[in-house]
């Protein structure tokens, strides 16, 4: 012990070492989650906790009391258990998070400190002298979740009482007795008394009958190792308690585990009549002001992107749509059959809604005409080592990961078996069928986005047989159709329910303008957007895919069909019931598929008449022919009767 340091304390006002905060980045991550998902626009205070190193574990570098906060600060505050241990000491805290930086700057800091300090004063007046109540901390924050900047300012409110150091010396024997007493305690006490060879808690001492005398000594367990031997800030409120009790002179033993303990005699300069508070933390430049944690450069870019993707979605729940179930949307596994114009735009819209699992299916290559209409492809995708364009599905999956690495995108270079196109290689066709069936089983929602009408038949049948949510989008030159197929329990029709013949080959013997997708470019964007929005609206409905077309949810309507027309810029919502003899979703077709599987599909691919016989369209056609013949006969009979008048 350097005697010069002891002499420097005598005859001067007692000084205290201010507390400093150390906030780990995990605390701000937890704060951003709390703000985004729970607090939203609410500015109610939140209970938190912090911790300091146990006094016996202080190092020579801890010359200031250091309050630590991390992600557990929120968890510990909400649990009944304490974080106190042989390693750390827990402190109670309160967080106030405001909504704007202007509010953070404009709030009256003096009034706020007084408001917070009054809570400590109330605890003292009610007889609660435990360190957790006497030395609470508070923090004012503003969270800029878009830029990942966090403004914060800690406060450690202290009630003012001025004391002068009259004597200062070492007390080895008292230090030994104090150590022995602390070793017997299950939980650390930071401030207690010793009277007539007996240690006791402060509240017990103050509530006892004994008066303070020359044998009374108060003990403060210090939480820092300042080279000037000044005690930590936590002592101030304990000394105020003594001053409030009318004590004018006291003996104070500042105990430190490193052997630098000192015994002081203190004298109160004046009776604290007015209640005054101090305690805003200063910056490293010793100025009053908040701190800034800019985590944008520290967070892993992929994690940063993951949080940013969800930010705008979660902001919807703050004011506009608090009931929105984003988790249900994000958990959807979506199968996109078609990776061209519609597939590209649908995938982008799905990612915008937070969907993370997207699977592409296509068997085409990127051509030079594609990139301007299909945003997942670029010029370099139009050629490869083979001299041909890259396969669309794998390239689309790669492009999604380039846009957002957190997406789980996969691809299958697969030719969907098409009705009206006889099977040429049964082994290959069956393998494609089995892969498609497995993909339908593994996914929750299926989008039909192919170029041809007949390629949608098998996915439509699979979706109905397996009761999946199927969204269909189709383009005309200046029109489009977006619809959701019915399920096994509702009465909504599918893409084929208005047909009286089975789908047939629409690709053979076509001119160039018939082979290419000749549409107004904006139609694909509109149809894709409506298709994804229809999916989300259905998911928000309590009945999901089973919802009737006329029903509403808090998120709006869930129509059956939306037909758009660009020539007059109009849209029409339509409803078409399930057709008893539909070639794709009627019960006879579904039952035949469930019982025969690939054999049924193969027979339909090879002979559309077989499908018409199963679903009943063949009989419908016969009835139509008989009705037509009857009308002709009737018309012929009328003509003969007319001749009688000639």
UniProtKB/Swiss-Prot annotation:
Predominant cellular place of this UniProt entry's protein: cytoplasm
Catalytic residues as annotated in Swiss-Prot or TrEMBL: 516
A single cellular component GO annotation: extrinsic component of phagophore assembly site membrane
Motif GXGXXG motif: positions: 338-343
Subcellular localization: Cytoplasm; Preautophagosomal structure
Record-linked InterPro entries: Atg7, Atg7_N, Atg7_N_1, Atg7_N_2, ThiF/MoeB/HesA, ThiF_NAD_FAD-bd, Ubiquitin-activating_enz
A GO molecular-function annotation: Atg8 activating enzyme activity
Pfam families with a match to the protein in the record: ATG7_N (PF16420), ThiF (PF00899)
Signal peptide start and end residues: none
Example of a GO biological process term: autophagy of mitochondrion
Family, as annotated: Belongs to the ATG7 family.
Record text on subunit structure and interactions: Homodimer.
Domain notes: The GxGxxG motif is important for the function, possibly through binding with ATP.
Stated role: E1-like activating enzyme involved in the 2 ubiquitin-like systems required for cytoplasm to vacuole transport (Cvt) and autophagy. Activates ATG12 for its conjugation with ATG5 and ATG8 for its conjugation with phosphatidylethanolamine. Both systems are needed for the ATG8 association to Cvt vesicles and autophagosomes membranes. Autophagy is essential for maintenance of amino acid levels and protein synthesis under nitrogen starvation.
Identification of the protein by name: Ubiquitin-like modifier-activating enzyme ATG7
Species, as recorded: Meyerozyma guilliermondii (strain ATCC 6260 / CBS 566 / DSM 6381 / JCM 1539 / NBRC 10279 / NRRL Y-324) (Yeast)
Taxonomic lineage of the native organism: Eukaryota, Fungi, Dikarya, Ascomycota, Saccharomycotina
Record gene name: ATG7
């Amino acid at each position: 012990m350097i005697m010069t340091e002891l002499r420097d304390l005598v005859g001067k006002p007692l000084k205290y070492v201010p507390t400093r905060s150390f906030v780990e980045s995990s605390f701000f991550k937890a704060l951003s989650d709390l703000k985004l998902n729970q607090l939203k626009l609410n500015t109610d205070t939140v209970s938190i906790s912090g911790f300091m190193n146990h006094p016996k574990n202080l190092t020579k570098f801890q010359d200031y009391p250091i309050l630590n906060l991390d992600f557990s600060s929120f968890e510990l505050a909400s649990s009944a258990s304490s974080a106190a241990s042989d390693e750390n000491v827990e402190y109670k805290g309160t967080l106030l998070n405001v909504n704007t930086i202007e509010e953070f700057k404009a709030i009256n800091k003096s009034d706020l400190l007084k408001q917070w300090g009054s809570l400590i004063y109330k605890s003292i007046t009610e007889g609660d002298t435990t360190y957790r109540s006497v030395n609470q901390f508070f923090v004012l924050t503003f969270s800029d979740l878009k830029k990942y900047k966090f403004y914060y300012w800690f406060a450690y409110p202290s009630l003012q009482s001025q004391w002068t150091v009259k004597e200062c010396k070492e007390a080895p024997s008292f230090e030994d007795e104090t150590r022995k007493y602390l070793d017997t305690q299950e939980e650390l006490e930071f401030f207690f008394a010793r009277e007539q060879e007996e240690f006791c808690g402060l509240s017990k001492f103050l509530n006892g009958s004994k008066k303070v005398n020359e044998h009374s000594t108060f003990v403060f367990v210090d939480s820092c190792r300042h080279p000037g031997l000044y005690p930590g800030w936590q002592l101030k409120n304990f000394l105020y308690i003594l001053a409030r009790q009318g004590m004018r002179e006291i003996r104070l033993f500042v105990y430190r585990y490193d052997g630098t303990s000192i015994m002081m005699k203190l004298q109160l300069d004046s009776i604290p009549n007015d209640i005054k508070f101090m305690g805003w933390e200063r910056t490293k430049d010793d100025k009053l002001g908040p701190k800034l944690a800019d985590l944008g450069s520290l967070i892993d870019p992929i994690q940063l992107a993951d949080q940013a993707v969800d930010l705008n979605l979660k902001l919807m729940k703050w004011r506009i749509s608090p009931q929105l179930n984003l988790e249900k949307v994000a958990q959807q596994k979506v199968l996109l059959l078609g990776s061209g114009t519609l597939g590209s735009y649908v995938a982008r819209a799905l990612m915008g809604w937070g969907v993370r699992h997207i699977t592409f299916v296509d068997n085409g290559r990127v051509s030079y005409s594609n990139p301007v209409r299909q945003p997942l492809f670029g010029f370099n995708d139009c050629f490869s080592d083979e001299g041909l364009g890259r396969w669309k599905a794998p390239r689309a999956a790669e492009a999604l990961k380039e846009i957002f690495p957190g997406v789980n995108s996969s691809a299958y270079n697969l030719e969907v078996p098409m009705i009206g196109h006889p099977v040429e290689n049964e082994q290959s066709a069956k393998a494609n069928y089995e892969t498609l069936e497995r993909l339908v089983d593994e996914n929750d929602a299926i989008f039909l986005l192919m170029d041809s009408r007949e390629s949608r038949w098998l996915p439509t049948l699979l979706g109905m047989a397996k009761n999946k949510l199927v969204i269909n989008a189709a383009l005309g030159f200046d029109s489009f159709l977006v619809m959701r197929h019915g399920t096994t329990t509702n009465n909504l029709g599918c893409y084929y329910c208005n047909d009286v013949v089975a789908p047939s080959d629409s690709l053979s013997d076509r001119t160039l303008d018939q082979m290419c997708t000749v549409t107004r470019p904006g139609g694909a964007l509109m149809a894709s957007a409506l298709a994804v929005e229809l999916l989300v609206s259905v998911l928000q409905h309590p009945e999901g895919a089973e919802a009737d077309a006329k029903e509403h949810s808090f998120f709006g309507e869930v129509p059956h069909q939306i037909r758009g027309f660009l020539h007059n810029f109009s849209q029409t919502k339509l409803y078409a019931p399930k057709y008893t003899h539909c070639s794709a979703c009627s019960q006879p077709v579904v039952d035949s598929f469930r019982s025969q599987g690939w054999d049924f599909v193969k027979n339909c691919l090879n002979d559309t008449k077989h499908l018409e016989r199963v679903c009943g369209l063949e009989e419908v056609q016969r009835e139509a022919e008989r009705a037509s013949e009857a009308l002709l006969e009737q018309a012929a009979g009328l003509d003969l009767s007319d001749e009688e008048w000639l």
